[in-house]
Amino acid sequence: MEKQGKQFISDYVIDGNRLDGYSKNGIGNYEGPVAFEIKYTHRYNPMIMRYTVRQLTGILDSEKIKHMILIYPADSDKMRYFLRNENPNLILWGITEINGLIDANKEEAEYIANSLFKLEIKKELNRRDNDWKKSREELLTSVKKAYKKGNISLLLGAGVSCSAGLPNWKTLLNSLYTNFVNKIFNDDTVDDDTIKAITNKFIEINNNSTLAIARYLKAGLSQKDDDIMFISAVKDALYSSQRTSSPLIESITNLCIPKRSGAKVKSIITYNFDDLIEESLSKVKLEYKTIYRDEEQHDSDELPIYHVHGFIPGRESFDREASLVFSEEAYHKVYSEPYHWSNLVQLATLRENNCLMIGLSLSDPNLRRLLEIAAQKQSKNCRHYAFIQRLSNDSLIDDSSCVKINEASVNKILQTHHIIQEKMMESLGTRVIWFEDYSEIPVLLDEIRK
């Protein structure tokens, strides 16, 4: 409006009808006076629309307004046809028109979006510090409801396996590189300290991309086009450490045990290679089906466990035809193929079920992409939940540092960080269930099962 040199008045009243906007001189190709009405909804409601159209048509009939622009995101061809027949001066601006305005006024649109986001952050900062625990209880109640309905799927990350003593990503790469160095020196006598020093230095130098390191190691540990040597090396590194009992895996297993009314967990998607979940389910004699490639199917009485990055069992031989999403090229392959079976499984699960994410850092760009796609197809309500650890003051205040950091400033920074993290995850259709210590997660899972 400013670019066209035309005045705009918000919250304008005509004959007792309060409208969202008014321009005496019109807008664009629409001759004035022009009035604006905005309806905030993402679903078309015929009853509400008929009432709205009747009200706006009445204002147009009074001839005090030349054109009426209805801004309504839940537009449809049927609705446009209906409005044209009612009154040709009743104009609909739907998603297409709104996006067109945004594209034509990108700087202004970005300014508005940033201003709204800052207002939202400021409002959230006024909450009391301990409100997050109250919010957590409310979220757990929502998860309980979905669990009781049997509409929960579990998404499990490396944190689950690490809770039982298996190596994290960095430790796994260290073990593989040690294997690689030993392979280079072959029969030469090289002491363990030298190998360890070389390994640590290599990982430090190439720390910017762990996927690139994995690709490098795969090339070094494989033979020609055969991945068997590499998968064997991964298996050795994965299961070399002593397993420990895991309260987290026990709590996950308990969630999966059916109740009288039936199974409450519909499926498990794991991004881990190991069989710790299968091993735990076997102990309680729960029927399951491990699925790690397209051809696999499960029976109705089996709990499907999808290993979307591949599967390497501990005590059994691995499938020689199986592939791992471990290195850079494998990740690129999955990322670039929208109809890859693992993408289809994840997307269907995210669209159809309430997902509870455990032990995931949520930094995986492919998972974030799938979450965003699923969120676009859903209503504005978030239907997924993720356990995420809160940052503490100690993580930002370094006692050894020469710079004295004000604790009050750190508290404000952390509070803002946590709010932004929540808003960012909400844009991916996910609500954050905060925890401070990993030992809290099994307790919270047990609370969901009650």
How would you name each of these model-derived features?
Residues 19-57:
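Conserved catalytic cores of phosphodiester-cleaving nucleases, focusing on short active-site segments
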